[in-house]
Amino acid sequence: LRKAGILMPITSLPSPYGIGTMGEAAREFVRFLHKAGQSYWQILPICPTSYGDSPYQSFSSYAGNPYMIDLDELSEAGLLEKDEYKNIDWGSNPEKADYGLLYNRRFGVLRKAAKTAEEKYQTELTEFRKENHKWLSDYALFMAIKDEQNGVSWLEWPEILRKRDNKALAVEREKLKDEIKFWECVQFLFFTQWKKLKAYANENGIKIIGDIPIYVSSDSADVWANPEQFQLDDNLMPISVAGCPPDGFSADGQLWGNPLFNWKVMKEQDYNWWVDRIAYQTQIYDMLRIDHFRGFDAYYSIPYGDKTARNGEWKEGPGIDLFNVIKEKLGELPIIAEDLGFLTDSVRKLLKDTGFPGMKVLEFAFDSRDTESGYLPHLYPKNCVVYAGTHDNETILGWFDTISEEDAEYAKKYMRLSEAEGYHWGMMRTAWASVADTAIMQMQDILGLGKNARMNTPSTLSDKNWSWRCLPGVYNDTLADVLHQEMKLYGRI
């Protein structure tokens, strides 16, 4: 079935409280998607962010981001008084999230709400703690110790805490019991709102596509609580880390720095870590986009401590074996494979064997440096998801500002672009008209925004990354009607 959707991070929704949340603006966006003839709302990972504000580098691959908790909803539930958050300065720029300011001001408000919630929702909290015990107790303990240790990475904690000495952890649990309760309660508040939002989306015929990074952050509860699943030495320091090799776009490659999986141990344990992770994510989302899918076929391993990715080497991943086990235990999986980047025949075979749809990015189709491009629409298989660009790319208008004249001419000719229609509409039209079963556009492109609205520039640390926000009133009925007509025209409703 031909469908379409919009990529819009929750943090990018309009809000008077500094960042997009799961409140009324999110429900308004769901209604907009429904009116616009869309079937999917794709979001970025909803995990807590850490240094650099990237949702792909999180303290936990299970937890929800406290910043996304809607304060008005907490107030309506009787957990906050309006004057406890309305008069706080959440930042002066409605088009940008200020993470530093949020870090300093949001938690004080959440502490007040959590205190009331502990009394008001005792039964529900007990149930939530029981249901999520597998990850929640480690995460809450991790965050409580982290605060006690002034926020430093767990790799710098005292050895007895790093190596999870049972006696030492028992002492911490007793000493930090109120803090642990707070971090657990914040997750309860997050997932209470999340379930409500997802149910609302589903009732309106909208499915949510979640995004899960293949790797987890080294400074995370995941690695601290499960060190045997990763390539760590006896001192729990990474042996090798993840990244991408040098190519025509980057002489040094990309050094991501995430610890690599110990696939040997994972296989011996029947991939339970992965089965648990995917099972959990499929409860939260309707579909999953798995980032860096090629890493399951072969992964790039860079010696820990290197400053660039030049000295890395390819090593064999688990391949189809992992997906066979997951499928056997969980059934058919609604997964989109992010298969961008350096692809080999064996990656293509793995994708084919799983049956997952891969991704096509239109912005990659017209690059004269890449003559092997499979990104031109006349080469697409039906079983794929086409994007004009993703969160890691320029917006369409930003892209036209950065590409060579030759590439721009090729793109204009191929897609029959005109200034009268607007290059962004012409490019999106090309994607919607393609044979790809699913077409997802960034909200920034639907709004015709330029390079200032780019979500992320990979391998850079900047307050421009992850901070774009949408102004109130921009997703309206007029825009929804235009999109609805396009969907009808190209058979996507």
What are these language model-derived features?
Residues 1-11, 27:
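N-terminal regions that are enriched for targeting/export leaders
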